[in-house]
Design a protein with these regions (language model features):
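Short glycine-aspartate micro-motif
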Residues: 3-7, 56-58, 95, 129-133, ...
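Short beta-strand-loop/turn "lid" adjacent to the catalytic site in phosphate-handling enzymes
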Residues: 49-96, 101-114, 131, 270-274
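Glycine-rich phosphate-binding loop of actin/hexokinase-like ATP-binding domains
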Residues: 117-120, 125-185, 274, 280-296
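ATP-binding/phosphotransfer module of carbohydrate and carboxylate kinases, centering on a glycine-rich
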Residues: 1-52, 171-322
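Short, acidic Gly/Pro/Ser/Thr-rich loop/turn segments
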Residues: 13, 64-66, 137-141, 195, ...
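Active-site nucleophile and cofactor-binding loops and adjacent substrate-binding regions
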Residues: 32-35, 74-76, 95-101, 121-124, ...
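ATP-dependent carbohydrate kinase catalytic cores
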Residues: 93-124, 217-232, 239
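Short amphipathic alpha-helical segments
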Residues: 17-18, 45, 70-72, 108-109, ...
Length: 322
């Protein structure tokens, strides 16, 4: 069976063509495109070319999916509708799923995971699993056992209110409020890294060398690399980011008690392992006011190293759930 899978984010669209029998997969072709302003259909047509034997397609999208329809959060595309995509692309079955649902399915169905463990915890096989990841935005999902597998559910938890409990982060919150209500994604994301840097540059360390990080094509990634190279403002920026990320993950852990594991997806964590391992993430993760930290110390916490989890999850969903 020929399956088309896509992972559509605010920055890039990844597409792949896979031959699968539901258990084994053979990737025939894989491409990455800038998401841009054209919409999904032109990108898929460009990718498929003359290929007309695709039976199923599953697209993982960075936004809420309701009734197989989705308006992607960080893209100017019109709403995507699976029924219309079936007609326009001449594909028999099309499903739209949240990108973190796709990531979740790949995590629960993939036997050979590539992980870095931040906290061993005490794994419980029948407990929920939580997934959180920062990139262009902040995504969250959770999974619960169902038979001999799991069922994955989406959330829009990245849009929870940012509620810091230390003075510096509260000053950051006040700074960001100039542009309206502040959700966690405004801080824990690639654009969030840039905003933290600007806050420190403008309000805390105006005499420090700011370098040319903000003029780079991906300033968030440039700032993270600057931190690794010892640049002061970048180091301070990433310290705030990692603490906020840990706190957001801890909030999720308090809600779901994911003793089946909390998995950190997305390129930012995978590309900044040393920053994630320095102890500040886990310290913020377990520091939850009236919640005994011993409880959250029992949650296994892992970084997922494969940054194509969403794409592979869309393949698995098409092969096993459609």
């Amino acid at each position: 069976m020929l399956v088309l899978a896509g992972d559509i984010g605010g920055t890039n669209t990844r597409l792949c063509l896979v031959e699968t029998d539901g258990k084994n997969e053979s990737t025939l072709r894989e491409e990455i495109y800038p998401s841009g302003n054209e919409g999904l259909v032109p990108l898929v047509r460009q990718f498929l070319g003359d290929e007309c034997n695709v039976y199923k397609a599953c697209f993982a999208l960075a936004g809420p999916v309701l009734n197989n329809k989705c308006k992607i959060t960080n893209l100017p595309w019109p709403e995507l509708d699976a029924a219309k995509l079936q007609e326009e692309l001449n594909i028999a079955k099309v499903s739209l799923i949240n990108d973190f649902v796709a990531i979740g399915y790949n995590i629960v169905l993939e036997k050979n995971k590539s992980l870095v463990t931040l906290q061993e915890g005490e794994f419980l096989p029948d407990a929920p699993i939580a997934i959180i990841g920062a990139g262009t935005g902040l995504g969250k999902a959770f999974a619960v056992p169902e038979g001999d597998s799991y069922r994955v559910f989406p959330t829009e938890g990245g849009h929870e209110s940012f509620a810091p409990d230390n003075l510096l982060a509260q000053e950051l919150l006040a700074y960001l409020r100039a542009d309206g209500k502040v959700d966690v994604e405004r801080v824990v994301s690639g654009p969030g890294i840039v905003d933290i840097f600007r806050f420190l540059q403008d309000h805390k360390f105006p005499s420090e060398d700011a370098g040319d990080f903000l003029s780079q094509s991906d300033p968030g990634a440039a700032i993270a690399k600057g931190a690794a190279a010892g640049h002061f403002l970048c180091q301070q920026t990433m310290a705030i980011f990692v603490e906020a990320f840990g706190a957001a993950a801890g909030d999720m852990a308090v809600s779901f008690l994911p003793f089946g594991g909390l998995y950190i997806a997305g390129g930012i964590a995978a590309q900044n392992i040393e920053l994630m391992q320095n102890g500040n993430f886990i310290k913020a993760f377990t520091d939850k006011a009236r919640v005994n930290p011993v409880l959250l110390e029992k949650v296994p916490v892992h970084i997922v190293l494969n940054t194509l989890e969403g794409l592979r999850g869309a393949v698995k969903y098409a092969a096993t759930k459609m």
